[in-house]
Regions:
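Acidic, low-complexity terminal tails and accessory targeting/binding regions
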Residues: 68-72, 78-90, 133-135, 151-195
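Phosphate-coordination/substrate-recognition cap region in phosphate-metabolizing enzymes
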Residues: 33-97, 101-104
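Short, basic/glycine-rich phosphate-binding loops at helix/coil junctions
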Residues: 5, 10-16, 93-107
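Loop-to-helix element that buttresses phosphate recognition and phosphoryl-transfer chemistry
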Residues: 2-57, 61, 111-120
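Glycine-rich phosphate-binding loop signature in dinucleotide/nucleotide-binding domains
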Residues: 40-43, 127-136
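Internal catalytic-core helix/loop-beta-alpha segment
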Residues: 99-131
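Alpha-helix/helix-capping structural signal
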Residues: 10, 143-144
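Generic beta-sheet signal
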Residues: 3, 135-143
Length: 195
């Protein structure tokens, strides 16, 4: 069976609200609702989410369609960027480029990419240790740590080249549960048809 990593789609950006508390925007919610109607979502037997609002909202829409309960896991959160707080999109993109290009260093107090990769990978692998590989599972989280997890699963060095395209999130990559081999690269969530 398959595992899928789902990044939350577009969020309601509010510089006055801590980033982990941002919720989905209207567009993001619409994309998640469209995705929830797809057959692969109904086949999910387990959904595990980051504890950030936007991820939980996405996971809940998928879980409602699958008829399962969302499990929340703190260690699946996005890389810790609280040291800088909100950065306007152009500044954030430059910072993200630096984050991926310098994985052993911290960008102005951010969690280092190597540490975020170890955290997300350890969380996912711990969950999979006790998971029945015959049951499809979704991990719902964030683009940065999702990319770091994908690099770990493929054995590739940390690189923004492995990041989701298009901006705004709302993508999936899938991997086989039997051997954890990545089976498809980032695909818009509402376009992915399963494996």
């Amino acid at each position: 069976m398959f595992g899928v990593y789902v990044t939350h789609p577009q969020v309601q950006i509010d510089p006055d609200v801590p980033v982990p508390q941002w919720g989905l925007s209207t567009v993001g919610r619409e994309r998640a609702v469209i995705t929830a109607a797809l057959p692969w979502v109904r086949s999910l037997g387990r959904i595990v989410s980051s504890d950030e609002t936007k991820a939980i909202e996405t996971a809940q829409l998928l879980a409602d369609a699958a008829g399962v309960t969302v499990e929340v896991h703190h260690d699946m959160g996005e890389n810790d960027r609280s040291a800088t707080g909100f950065l306007p999109p152009p500044e954030f993109e430059k910072a993200a480029d630096w984050f991926f290009a310098n994985p052993t260093e911290s960008f102005k107090g951010w969690e280092r990419a190597i540490d975020a990769q170890a955290r997300i990978s350890d969380a996912v692998f711990r969950i999979l240790e006790d998971h029945d590989p015959k049951i499809p599972i979704a991990f719902v989280g964030h683009g940065g740590v999702g990319t770091l997890l994908k690099c770990r699963l493929t054995g590739a060095p940390i690189s923004r080249a492995a990041d989701q395209k298009g901006g705004g999130g709302g993508n999936v990559f899938a991997f086989r549960l039997a051997d954890r081999a990545v089976a498809c690269d980032w695909t818009p969530m509402e376009h992915w048809q399963g494996i």
